[in-house]
Amino acid sequence: EAKLGLKFEHRHGQAYYTAQLKPQHVDLIRQAETSKSVLQLVNTWLERMPFFGDGQIWTGFENEISVEGWHPFWTRYRQLYQQSLASAEKENQQAFDLVFADKTEASADRQLSPAASRAALFIMLYRGYPVLQLPFQLLNGLLEIDEQLSSWRYRHMNMVHRMIGTRIGTGGSTGKDYLRAAADKHYIFREVAQLTSFLIERRRLPQLPIAMERKLGFAI
């Protein structure tokens, strides 16, 4: 979990996490927590998406009324997303800006930077293009890891409940309660999963410029 990207401060039962381990094993965990995690490497990879730095391939978007700090594509997409929201979802617009706008209050608390979040959402939106198929499968694989870990924790929780019921476990709380709380909190790639809240209908997606479509397609 530490190597994947679950930070110590995001764990449930932090005191119990290493209390039952031998010193040499605690040292191994500390080393894992201080080294680059999978989530950090994914963030760096997403930030390197090249397409938004080349203004020449974004013909047709130059006349967008630009919002300060936003690429013309994201200015248009932001408007389309706002139009897609139901009356009960209007607060999602603020969440959109917090996640994707540079230099926001939420940026410091998130492990994915705004640039990485925009790149991941772009991959999800246009995953039908050949160049984005493998990146989308990678992102989807990260979510499957979380799902499998959650499934394992749930089965483990049920096994502990059958074995000791509501007896106190080694963590000082009932074993079932500890495992349930850990299962609810330990989602490593939660920020990737939350990006689906910002999708719109595929038929309403902005049409990409021909030059961009060529870059995302098969080279002939």
Predicted segments, located by residue:
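Extended amphipathic alpha-helical segments with heptad-repeat/coiled-coil character used for oligomerization
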Residues: 1-60
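C-terminal accessory extensions/subdomains outside the catalytic/core fold
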Residues: 36-115, 120-220
